[in-house]
């Protein structure tokens, strides 16, 4: 598990470059915003403000290469049993180097350390998450609170992101399969069509 006080160093590219995963601090806000908002400008992620990242900075992990931030991701709690992996961004020049995978592994380890039963994400790349043990689920099966960010998204009425879920506790998996909101922390939302 990632310690809030010490980083987790990993060697990538055959040992040529040192990567460090650590909890984000206030000094990381500007580079986090740069990463996230570069993708937001392409319509791939929701834009974030300095206030939002400041408010949620404890949710974030960052990954550094040669002292420079090359990736970030956050674990946001919704219920005592489920959290969302969000704001996952990797610098363009560092894609396909395992940074996204390492961030997901670190965030999942952090979720397990908090005894969460499951984590979910909204994504355009479900294949990547599938390789990390996530399964596609219906959006309406996720916690109602997860939709608060969706309300400000320009694609809210015609969302094309895929919901994915990774179960960390097999007992939770049984509850999830039976769609029992009382035990699973999930809420079934009705499907509303636009006319």
Residue positions per predicted region:
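A short, internal acetyl-CoA/4′-phosphopantetheine-binding micro-motif in the GNAT/acyltransferase core
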Residues: 88-95, 124-125
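Conserved acetyl-CoA-binding loop-helix of GNAT-fold acetyltransferases
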Residues: 96-111, 121
């Amino acid at each position: 598990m990632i310690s809030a006080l010490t980083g987790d160093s990993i060697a990538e590219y055959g040992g040529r470059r040192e990567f460090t995963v650590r909890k984000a601090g206030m000094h990381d806000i500007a580079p986090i915003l740069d990463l996230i908002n570069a993708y937001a400008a392409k319509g791939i992620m929701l834009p974030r403000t300095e206030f939002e990242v400041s408010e949620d900075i404890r949710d974030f992990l960052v990954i550094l290469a040669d002292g420079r931030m090359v990736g970030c991701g956050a674990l946001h709690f919704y219920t005592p049993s489920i959290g969302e992996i969000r704001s996952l961004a990797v610098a363009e020049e560092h894609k396909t180097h395992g940074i996204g995978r390492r961030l997901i592994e670190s965030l999942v380890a952090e979720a397990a350390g908090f005894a969460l039963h499951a984590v979910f994400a909204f994504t355009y790349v479900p294949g990547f998450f599938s390789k990390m043990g996530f399964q596609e689920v219906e959006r309406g099966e996720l916690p109602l609170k997860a939709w608060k960010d969706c309300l400000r998204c320009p694609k809210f009425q015609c969302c094309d992101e895929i919901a994915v879920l990774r179960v960390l506790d097999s007992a939770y998996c049984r509850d999830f399969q039976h769609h029992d909101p009382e035990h699973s922390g999930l809420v079934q939302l009705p499907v509303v069509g636009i006319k």
